[in-house]
Amino acid sequence: MKNLILICAFIVGLSTYAQNTIKQDLGDFNTLKVYNGIELELVKSSSQKIEITGEKANLVKIKNVNNTLKLSLPFSLKPSDNSAEGKILVKLYYNKNIDLIDVNEGATITGKNFNQDKVSLNAQERGFINLTTKTKYLSIRATSGGIIKVSGTSKNQEVDLDLYGIYHGFNLQSTGNTNVKAGTGAKAEVNAGETLNAKVSFGGTIFYKGNPEVVKDKKVIGGIIEKRN
């Protein structure tokens, strides 16, 4: 009898897992946007597909229009259904370049070995991006408490932060040009290569490592530009 109960519990567990696992093939896309606290992992693959697990997996809205893939939750009058709350985990398998990665509303995107010639990373509304990459041109934009962390290599990087946006880039080796702007309450950490063009305003902060041959800095109404060892 005890064994029968255990077997039934195991079957129910498998059924529950299956109900909360969604798999779907995807068409082409070059822009990725994620919302509502959804946690997503990028996985380089030979095909394009998505796998969603977690208690709220069935709530995720997948929309792929005009090469833009959006993952979000539909609006609900029940506040708890408007946020993933750690109950949605997504694995996104891709085989083509993703030109723009954009996180919003506390969503998270992570990935390793994200290697392509150029990529733009945007984070806002407490969204978080954490990537390891090898690229020639990297564009960073963070605002409204968005956080971006990048390690690896890039020839050139363009960083634009405002409204308490944060960029952790000390572990990104840049060999060429680094242009950084940090506005209200924003903070940038960069590893500069040949040149550094830094501009802060309204209490922004830029910390940099490396020994750039040319350093141009401009401060407007406060702010900090400082070299770190």
Protein language model regions, located:
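Short, surface-exposed interaction patches in beta-rich subdomains
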Residues: 148-229
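Sec-dependent N-terminal signal peptides
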Residues: 4-14
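Acidic (Asp/Glu) and glycine-rich low-complexity loops/linkers
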Residues: 5, 19-104, 108-122, 132-139, ...
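First exposed extracellular module after export/assembly in secreted or surface-exposed proteins
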Residues: 58, 128-131, 190, 205
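Short acidic/polar mixed-charge low-complexity motifs
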Residues: 38, 56-58, 146, 186, ...
